[in-house]
């Protein structure tokens, strides 16, 4: 009984750290099914400087493509800046390429939270294939 209770407490603690992100679509004709972020326990998600964030995306591809590129940007002082330290080539171990139109893909990416000033801002994630933009999502975040 005690082991079962400990197991439930651990599962509960871990699951509280992963949350479906509130996002708005921003283009592309692919289907963005879900975006989950960890660690995140609020809306908007609050990230600590110098830590890593894991983003889980489920999407349906709208095009056949030999490539899949991630373009992640964060708004700083009104300018869209690339998120530093991320792998932009999703075919390098994240997505099985070539991408096939109509197939569902689950992508997990790890992003370092830069040690910038504290701010509330917007992050934009785009997945781009050979024929252009496939999916795009925007979400508010807080960096502390």
UniProtKB/Swiss-Prot annotation:
Keywords: Disulfide bond, Secreted, Signal
Bridged cysteine pairs (disulfide): 26-136, 40-45, 91-97
Protein induction: By feeding.
Annotated Gene3D superfamilies: 2.60.40.770
SMART domains on file: ML (SM00737)
Free-text tissue specificity from the UniProt record: Expressed in gut and hemolymph. Not expressed in salivary glands, ovarium or Malpighian tubes.
Annotated GO MF terms: sterol binding
InterPro entries: Ig_E-set, ML_dom, NPC2-like
GO biological process terms on file: sterol transport
Gene Ontology annotations for the cellular component aspect, listed alphabetically: extracellular space
Sequence similarity: Belongs to the NPC2 family.
Function, as annotated: Binds human IgE in vitro, and may neutralize IgE antibodies present in blood from repeatedly tick-bitten people. Does not have antimicrobial activity against E.coli or M.luteus.
Protein name: Mite group 2 allergen-like Ixo r 2
Species name: Ixodes ricinus
Lineage: Eukaryota, Metazoa, Ecdysozoa, Arthropoda, Chelicerata
């Amino acid at each position: 009984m005690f082991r079962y209770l400990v197991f439930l407490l651990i599962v509960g603690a871990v699951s509280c750290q992963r949350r479906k992100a509130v996002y708005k679509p921003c283009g592309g004709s692919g289907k963005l099914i879900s975006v989950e972020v960890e660690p995140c326990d609020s809306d908007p998600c609050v990230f600590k400087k110098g830590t890593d964030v894991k983003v889980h995306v489920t999407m349906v591809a709208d095009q056949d493509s030999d490539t899949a590129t991630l373009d992640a940007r964060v708004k700083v002082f009104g300018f869209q800046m690339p998120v530093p330290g991320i792998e932009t080539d999703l075919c390098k171990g994240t997505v099985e390429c070539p991408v096939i139109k109509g197939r569902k893909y689950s992508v997990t990416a790890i992003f370092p939270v830069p040690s910038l000033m504290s701010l509330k801002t917007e992050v934009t994630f785009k997945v781009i294939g050979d024929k252009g933009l496939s999916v795009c999502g925007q979400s508010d975040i807080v960096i502390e």
